[in-house]
Swiss-Prot record:
MF annotations from Gene Ontology: rRNA binding; structural constituent of ribosome
Biased composition (Gly residues): 23-35
One annotated Gene Ontology cellular component of this protein: cytosolic large ribosomal subunit
Source species: Trichodesmium erythraeum (strain IMS101)
Protein name: Large ribosomal subunit protein uL15
Superkingdom classification of source: Bacteria
Length: 161
């Protein structure tokens, strides 16, 4: 195929509308724009976002600094200081904390934060630990084990084993 063989498809190229060339053309005098008014003038269109003079949407909404993450992980959080009320060598899971009454709501997988002191050894199973929480639990002689979010919210039967 050569460049001379590339011709446009029949009917694809139409001539532009010739306006203002007399009444016999069908687009004479006002060129199909009606009578008077802003829309009949040259350059007579409004800018994008113009709402006729009322306060536009982009000025009604506040200037937002960033936007919230759509897929943010939501955790049930608890500080190390709350775990100090448990007896020594207890297996700590989300289900056991709800059963004891330390946590009242299940907002998602368990995350241990490092605020406060801990001086009893515990076996803690959670979806996430902060670095300070992990160091405080291990310094007290306990152990930290990260489990997946699916295991963190599993039923109580699996925690009794």
């Amino acid at each position: 195929m050569r460049l001379k063989d590339a011709i446009p498809k029949k009917g694809s190229q139409q001539r532009g509308r010739r306006v203002g060339r007399g009444i016999s053309a069908g687009q004479g005098a006002s060129c199909g724009k009606g009578m008077r008014g802003q829309k009949s003038r040259s350059g007579g269109s409004t800018r994008p976002g113009f709402e006729g003079g009322q306060n536009p949407l982009y000025r009604r909404l506040p200037k937002l600094k960033g936007f919230p993450m759509v897929n943010r992980k939501k955790y049930t959080i608890i500080n190390v200081s709350k775990l100090s009320s448990l007896p020594a060598n207890t297996e700590v899971t989300l289900a056991s904390l709800i059963k004891v009454g330390i946590i009242t709501t299940d907002d998602g997988p368990l995350k241990i934060l490092g605020d406060g002191d801990l001086n009893i050894p515990l076996k803690v199973y959670a979806a996430a630990f902060t670095a300070s929480a992990r160091s405080k639990i291990e310094a007290a002689g306990g152990s930290c084990e990260e489990i997946g979010p699916a295991q963190a919210v599993s039923n109580e039967d699996s925690t009794k084993e």
